UniProtKB/Swiss-Prot annotation:
Claim: Flavoprotein is one of the keywords in the record: no
GO biological process, one term: NAD biosynthetic process
Annotated pathway: Cofactor biosynthesis; NAD(+) biosynthesis; NAD(+) from deamido-NAD(+) (ammonia route): step 1/1
Stated name of the protein: NH(3)-dependent NAD(+) synthetase
Native species: Limosilactobacillus reuteri (strain DSM 20016) (Lactobacillus reuteri)
Class of this enzyme: ligase
CDD domains: NAD_synthase
Amino acid sequence: MRKYQEEIINALGVNSQIDPQAEVTKRVQFICDFLQTTKMKALVLGISGGQDSSLAGRLSQLAVEKLREETGDNEYQFIAVRLPYGEQADESDAMFAINDFIKPDKIMRVNIKAATDAMVASLNEAGTPISDFSKGNIKARERMIVQYAIGGENKGAVVGTDHAAEAVTGFYTKFGDGGADITPLSGLDKRQGKALLQYLGAPAKLYDKTPTADLEEDKPMRPDEEALGVRYDEIDDYLEGREVSPAAAEKIESWYRRTQHKRHLPIAPYDTWWK
């Protein structure tokens, strides 16, 4: 195993082998403990219909159901949120995940197109033209604004979908989908998340769907693997301590170095990690 590979695995808390049943039990209890300790009553999560939000959503629903049963407090709830920019190409996938697998207590829909377009227009008027890439990040941050607004009105916490295969590459928007109060998938790689979904009886289409951030209008539904330049199977092998090609290892390690800032709080005068 490469020395840096071992450091990354330890930093992200990845185990080479997991028991899906034990992981589900542990992560549901983690969510329950968080809610009881913080005195919050709700969980809020944007649902895209892909593997990560489907898994985080189902774990969240199981957690609030467990708390209601154990405490008799029916205030505990999970709110699944659809956050389309206009008409989303994968809308049917998202609704399938919500209705057929996650089965949340409450479903909300907030279209972020007007807010996003207004922000872009205002920036253009201020003399700062916005690229399609930057507009994609604005979309991600608008979605998080909505989720925190819903959470604030419902004594709720925002659930993040970050996991080890995403964290190692920093493949998320800083203060967008990277912003959350609790990340129940942390430490899992992509294939381990799939194993949890299979244990939970999820339909195959939820974990076989090609992962995509789908933020750029110039490149709609662009696969994550195309943007990253490395396959998730290679990322998972790397995180599980297996040997991967030198090219794949170097690509993963390059992403990890370049995105360190996303895995830290804002840099303070006494911080040294960035130097």
